[in-house]
Amino acid sequence: MTRFVFITGGVVSSLGKGIASAALAALLQARGYRVRLRKLDPYLNVDPGTMSPYQHGEVFVTDDGAETDLDLGHYERFTGVHATRADNATTGQIYSDVIARERRGDYLGATVQVIPHITDAIKEAVVAGTEDLDFVLVEIGGTVGDIESLPFLEAIRQLRNDLGAGQTMFVHLTLLPWIPSAGELKTKPTQHSVKELQNVGIQAQMLLCRSDRPIPDTERRKIANFCNVRPEAVIAALDVDTIYACPVSYHAEGMDTEVLRHFGLPHDQEPDLSAWNRVLDAMRHPEGEVRIAVVGKYTALLDAYKSLIEALQHGGIANRVRVKLDWVEAEIFEKSETAIEALRDAHAILVPGGFGERGSEGKIQAVRFAREHNIPFLGICFGMQMAVIECARNLAGLPDASSTEFGPTEEPLVGLMTEWARGNELLRRREGGEMGGTMRLGAYAAKLAEGSRVAEIYGKTEIRERHRHRYEVNVHYREVLEKAGLQFSGMSPDDILPEVVEYPNHPWFVAVQYHPELLSKPFDPHPLFSGFVGAAVKKMRLV
């Protein structure tokens, strides 16, 4: 029997529903249960693929090519269970599906309404493909009281009736603010949030209360009394030094025990949290610190690089060092000739993905600085494209090398595959048309050159990595670039698409077209990030 746990949030946004959901899933998984997490997003966009990074943060890409909410990254990192496009539904997707059904005549002339048609579609999205699971945890985006969330709340209310109380549970995440002048935690916001939830017909069975300090028993009983839950079901979600402490912290508060008790399942045996304890030990007892400069273009909102930040921390865990990130806006290198010297103290330099011309010349300067000063370098997606252009301009005698993303160029080192392989049977994009759905998305196979650094890093020559890009490195320039010293050490199986480049004579210089950060886990760091941070450690010890 599949059990559904619905996680809602109240009082304020950004309380950490995604982390809480992932932590609970990890605890249930540590007890041997099969779990899956899903996210319902109340925005009207079909997916976040065309949303600004400043608006939405990172777009997390799944193996099957879905562009999803960044919370799905947390789900994967905490559980190791790969998400699919079925695990993220938006209002835009739901409405598009219902309207398409109406146009086909599926509703047989009925008046199409939010109830039952939209809510039925939401319920279908929640339960689809969950037959072989023990638990499905469903996070409802937004905050209770938002008008956008109402159809989703109504749908999960109906699901409790459809499935029965024995198969469903509602967990509500709230805030307990500390008021210094009063010297106490205030419970009134939580009470009002629960009342708001009750107004739409939902009674929470557990309250997860965010707080920067323990909840006194008197306040716990008060919350339980006013909010109609058991005192044991008032769980303190205390602030912790790292998100990876949440499973251990929530278990200490009895969260997983209370969930199992609600469903009438055995809860006497302790979960196996040994992997989480090893992660925490490595993070809390580092043997050094490395400084990595990240030269980006969305540094005003670090959520745009969420998976990257986590993957670098995973590399630190693998090497038992603390990773300190120095965020550098690429454009500063274009405005000042001396600004590039800020990279001199870095133990490693990373140029991440991005879109558009802004900051591209600054990134190219950062690539050159890393190459010329023997600083470990990792380029990702757009970062690889800039590394290739830098090589073409400064080593291969092609000063006009550029990307067609920035405009017409005589030397299109980077371009849409349609521009330099027109007619190829492997083309997956449309010229022109809508921006959504025009990228290379999802997991693709690649082959690595025998004896290359990247093959040594992976320990194998066949890999599968996730992509999200519209432009490709032009394979027609491979020969001239390799003569200049840049090895094409990873290619698509058909030898059409360059996947990895490296400088064999550099201490550690690797650039990849894909996004390795999307597959990294705290207890299973991605080899590229383990190797990159390891190279930074060697550089640190030489300084």
UniProtKB/Swiss-Prot annotation:
InterPro entries linked: Class_I_gatase-like (IPR029062), CTP_synthase (IPR004468), CTP_synthase_N (IPR017456), GATASE (IPR017926), GATase1_CTP_Synthase (IPR033828), P-loop_NTPase (IPR027417)
Keywords (A to Z) from UniProt: ATP-binding, Glutamine amidotransferase, Ligase, Magnesium, Metal-binding, Nucleotide-binding, Pyrimidine biosynthesis
GO molecular function: ATP binding; CTP synthase activity; glutaminase activity; identical protein binding; metal ion binding
Annotated stretches, region: Amidoligase domain: 1-265
GO-annotated biological processes: 'de novo' CTP biosynthetic process; pyrimidine nucleobase biosynthetic process
Residues reported in the UniProt entry to bind L-glutamine: 54, 354, 382-385, 405, 470
Regulation: Allosterically activated by GTP, when glutamine is the substrate; GTP has no effect on the reaction when ammonia is the substrate. The allosteric effector GTP functions by stabilizing the protein conformation that binds the tetrahedral intermediate(s) formed during glutamine hydrolysis. Inhibited by the product CTP, via allosteric rather than competitive inhibition.
Binding site for CTP: 13, 146-148, 186-191, 222
Record: active site: 381, 515, 517
Reaction catalyzed: UTP + L-glutamine + ATP + H2O = CTP + L-glutamate + ADP + phosphate + 2 H(+); L-glutamine + H2O = L-glutamate + NH4(+); UTP + NH4(+) + ATP = CTP + ADP + phosphate + 2 H(+)
One protein family per Pfam: CTP_synth_N
Binding site for UTP: 13, 186-191, 222
Binding partners and assembly: Homotetramer.
Protein family (similarity comment): Belongs to the CTP synthase family.
Record-given protein name: CTP synthase
Gene, per the UniProt record: pyrG
